[in-house]
Amino acid sequence: MTPKKKEAVDSLHYETQHGQAINCDSLEYMKSLPDSSIDLVITSPPYALHFKKEYGNVEKHEYVDWFIPFAKEIKRILKDSGSFVLNIGGSYEKGTPTRSIYQFKLLVALVEQVGFHLAQEGFWYNPAKMPMPAEWVTVRRIRIKDSVEYVWWFRIIIR
């Protein structure tokens, strides 16, 4: 079935018999949704990168505080039987060949502050991913290309 485009006030909106895809400010949109009304939220938010992207991204030290409002809204709109799946990539510490742990700090905050349960973790293997940071991977060759990202599956109630 070909998705049909549906006009929306401030977003691109596609709908099929299987669900909807909405392109908008997700935090504002979630605020308009009723409690316990969604079965599944899948997201891959902007990563904490060293260089600014046109679509916007925050620094590693701000990342958890930036994402928590989204997580609280996701928890509010999820049904008790619902799932939240988060894809998040890693990052290096600026100027050093060492990895940041910002995504693990987020994982702990999602469980301890927001109240999600980590149901399962998975890994997305992306061999086409760019070799970043270039200084450590392609120039000095002291780190291998990072071709894996985390995919975390959260639940509110574990069954």
Q: Where are the predicted features?
A:
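Core catalytic lobe of class I
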Residues: 2-159
